[in-house]
Amino acid sequence: MKIIKITPRGFCKGVVDAYATCKKIAKLYPNHEKYLIGWLVHNKEIIKELEELGIQTKDDKNHSRSEIIDSIEIKDKNNPPIVIFSAHGTDQKTIDKAREKGLVVFDTTCIYVTKTHDLIKEKIEQGYQIFYIGVNNHPETISTLSIDKSIILIETVNDIENIRTESEKPIFVTNQTTISIYEFEEITETLKSKYKNIEFKNDICNAAKDRQDAVINMPSEVDLLLVVGDIKSNNSKKLVEIGIKKQIESHLIWNTKNIKDEWFINKKCLAITSGCSTPTWLANYVIIFLEKKLGTAND
């Protein structure tokens, strides 16, 4: 079987920067309790590595980040706990609460997420109604919706028919940085047919877009796609969805243990890629495993 290693793959710059910040914090503050508020990025291997550095992840779907901050005790005022907010973004009130409480705060929010937030705030000040295309309950979406209660979330095209908004307000549409280009195009085309006074800004980040484009433009000979990424990783799951949309059998794998032999039956060309939050070493480990398993090594 031929193997094609799709590039780019692996960590994006935002993840590299966030991870480097955590490693620096671990080195500079050895005597402080250190907590990640939410997964730094959606990958279990990274969370394990950070735990080994003394950084504990606090993430609970039943409690908000604000409530998590409330639960952190300051036992030594000379060495207060350090809290690190994830790359997906966190609402400003929660960050302010952490500082007011006396915690040492580090915010690793991705620059692309910050740019989207700044643009939304600017458009709200200009009198626009904001439509936000994103995944409900994803931390990036939660942080964005916290900017203003008037922001309307659109998860699928089916949500559009239920939208109720002030007709005289101009509409500005932007999106979560890790949705697929297909989702953005499908939803925006439907919105164009319903609203006249509407503007769009595609805020899919460059790293996610580059990885999506690479899958979209895979050689036609590919008949099996494997994406190395965590089950919680939205950008990794979108790569799988794009493969399926191209009518290629596609699977998300987070280690070598969930690779199934039946996937390779009657297949001739395997393409491998990974999400923005997948460590390069993990993607390479899976590639080497598959090369040995399939008895081949190709570019």
From Swiss-Prot:
Keyword terms, alphabetized: 4Fe-4S, Iron, Iron-sulfur, Isoprene biosynthesis, Metal-binding, Oxidoreductase
One Pfam family, short name: LYTB
Transmembrane region positions? none
Could you tell me the Gene Ontology terms of the biological process aspect for this record?
A: dimethylallyl diphosphate biosynthetic process; isopentenyl diphosphate biosynthetic process, methylerythritol 4-phosphate pathway; terpenoid biosynthetic process
Please give the Gene Ontology molecular function terms for this protein.
4 iron, 4 sulfur cluster binding; 4-hydroxy-3-methylbut-2-enyl diphosphate reductase activity; metal ion binding
Instruction: Provide the residue positions that the database annotates as binding dimethylallyl diphosphate.
Output: H42, H88, H138, S233, N235, S277
Which pathway, per its entry?
Isoprenoid biosynthesis; dimethylallyl diphosphate biosynthesis; dimethylallyl diphosphate from (2E)-4-hydroxy-3-methylbutenyl diphosphate: step 1/1; Isoprenoid biosynthesis; isopentenyl diphosphate biosynthesis via DXP pathway; isopentenyl diphosphate from 1-deoxy-D-xylulose 5-phosphate: step 6/6
Which InterPro entries does this entry report, sorted A to Z?
LytB/IspH
To which protein family does this belong? Belongs to the IspH family.
Q: What PANTHER family does its record include? A: 4-HYDROXY-3-METHYLBUT-2-ENYL DIPHOSPHATE REDUCTASE
- Tell me the protein's name: 4-hydroxy-3-methylbut-2-enyl diphosphate reductase
